[in-house]
UniProtKB/Swiss-Prot annotation:
Family annotation (NCBIfam families): murE
Transit peptide feature, positions: 1-59
Region entry Disordered, spans: 13-159, 176-205
Subunit structure and binding partners: Component of the plastid-encoded plastid RNA polymerase (PEP) complex.
Function per UniProt: Required for the activity of the plastid-encoded RNA polymerase (PEP) and full expression of genes transcribed by PEP. Required for the proper build-up and formation of the PEP-complex.
GO biological process: one example: regulation of cell shape
Knockout or disruption consequences: Pale yellow-green leaf phenotype. Reduced levels of plastid ribosomes and defects in plastid mRNA metabolism.
Lineage: Eukaryota, Viridiplantae, Streptophyta, Embryophyta, Tracheophyta
Organism expressing this protein natively: Zea mays
Name of the featured protein: UDP-N-acetylmuramoyl-L-alanyl-D-glutamate--2,6-diaminopimelate ligase MurE homolog, chloroplastic
Gene Ontology CC annotation, any one: chloroplast
Keyword Nucleus listed: no
Amino acid sequence: MATAPLAFRLPFPFSFPSASRPPPSRILAPPTPRRLPLRLAAAAARRFRPPTADDEPPEAAEDSSHGLTRYDQLARSVERARIRQPEITPDNPLFSSPSTAGGGGGGSYDPDDEFFDEIDRAIAEKREEFTRRGLIKPSPASPPPSQSQPEDEDLTDELSPEEVIDLDEIRKLQGLSVVSVADEEDEEVEGGEDEDDGLPLDEDGEGFDVAEELGLEGARMRQPAFRMTLAELLDESKLVPVAVTGDQDVALAGVQRDASLVAAGDLFVCVGEDGLAGLTEADKRGAVAVVADQDLNIEGTLACRALVIVDDILTALRVLPACLYSRPSMNMAIIGVTGTDGVTTTTHLVKAMYEAMGVRTGLVGVLGTYAFSSNKLDARPDASSDPIAAQKLMATMLHNGTEAVVLEKGTDGMPPSGVDSEIDYDIAVLTNVRHTDEENGMTYEEYMSRMASLFSRMVDPERHRKVVNIDDPSAPFFAAQGGHDVPVVTYSFENKKADVHTLKYQLSLFETEVLVQTPHGILEISSGLLGRDNIYSILATVAVGIAVGAPLEDIVRGIEEVDAIPGRCELIDEEQAFGVIVDHARTPEALSRLLDGVRELGPRRIVTVVGCCGEKERGKRPVMTKIAADKSDVVMLTSDNPANEDPLDILDDMLAGVGWTMEEYLKYGANDYYPPLPNGHRLFLHDIRRVAVRAAVAMGEQGDVVVITGKGNDTYQIEGDKNEFFDDREECREALQYVDQLHRAGIDTSEFPWRLPESH
């Protein structure tokens, strides 16, 4: 690298003090009932335990008036016991089992026996009573002396009195049955049918973990098992195949369209050229049947047992998994959130609000899939756009007790309209619509049609609800989709005609405070989510809460529970005096909105790190630099997944955004000085992203905001053929550990190259 080398190692992390706020009081009113009664998650049990005493109880004073110490008293007691020991025989009732002592099998009491006291008498009488009533089983009788082993009788004469007593105890123990682990399991299963013997078992013979019952983290996720014959599946799905060959009674355990995911017993849906190419692999992995839209020769070439030919393979793709997995969305509340921006944040806030109401809520989105709480499921980021993955994930959630699911219906990789029409949505939410043909590869009409498919299913006024942002010009179009008598809840930043709107708000580097007007009262919300765009997500969540009749206190509590969305204007807080934000903005539009939002926070300076990916989208590189240079006080250009392209070539393209070339920049570096841009802002570059991120964080001073863009929550860097771990957030945290040391050393980190005080 031709830039001036750094004279020291740059490490980093960091964070901002978040204002503490008292939790709002809980409203005890339950949420409005839905189609099916919502089972409220159990709250963690709290048991009162009295505090332990500060001091141990005083020890009784030793009584030595008789001239004997405690040790002497103990020695005398032992000696007396040894003297009496020969008088104790195995025939004494004290050493006999209840059956032999009384002959009744239920235990008895001998009034002439000096070894029984009042407690022994009560126990024996109760045992006899319970035995007569059949509440307990009689103790097994000891074998008669005649059945004892002859060798044991011969040994008795040779044993000491102590050994005789031990032998008698051994004989008693021989009458006990040894219970194996398998026997205990059998008894537990039998006892599961009797409600008096314990908690009832669930249908698959396994009880929920305690953590799972309480809705806590770490609960064990149980995988449901499905089984249906091909004939039953075709009948249930109402598909009319063109032809069916092979065994229609073959049992199916799952559905897949990706050959690499096929497991034994699966039905393989052969879609397009990729499906045909993966047919052999699916067969080797154990696919037992194939669905295709063209005739295939499976006899003699494939081991699968059946072939179904259909006219519309996409219809089969969405209907078959829904039927095989028993249409799980019919038994849960499903909230779909669509739009261009703010979709991810809104889904997380809605999930948190439902859980604040006590509803076990799952989420399917690009940042992860959760069954409920923080219990994550293994799923691809595009799972909500995959009809097979979505149905299977929802079936798993339902099997684990999930009552509501929030689905993220973003525009990235959006599927054709209607591909998820087998999901029974209850609420449709629109954030906003921003469309560019170049970014989405779709016309405006196609783009709108795909998003509107969610709202077109809102037809039942008793169950469905529409939630729209009326600040967006497309809001009337979406509100008109589906049934016209379905209630519509509107929200707006400033429009007072909306059902939910802001009355007052305050933005800062560390939190957002907003006063929200609703039809049922005013909400005061303090959130760790930064910027104006996140206020829209908060308003959308409040509108969903109003639509379902959620208690206002639960709405506030749920929203305030979410401190950050990974990689979405995420604040890195290590208690430093300046802000550090990590965001996934990687397009000119997203970068512009992000920096505008950061400027609204009122920072002293904005220091921005921006990079562009290799091997694609060369046209946007100078545009990204131009936006960053115009809206930031300091810009640090760097690489972002350069792949097989030279990072210096990428940076050369980016420098064109400010009218520089790489040759000019290197010439400045040779003179140890980089001049300001025409607007007075500064620009530096470093081809190593780790150095660029850490250097930018080290430039931060009190009141500044350092913005790291491009990766967000992504945790990898692609260089050449290597895909290595890299996390902007961890780099920032590591860097922040050393910022104070650099500043105390007097090093000027405000610009490149860094200088020691004597070099000024």
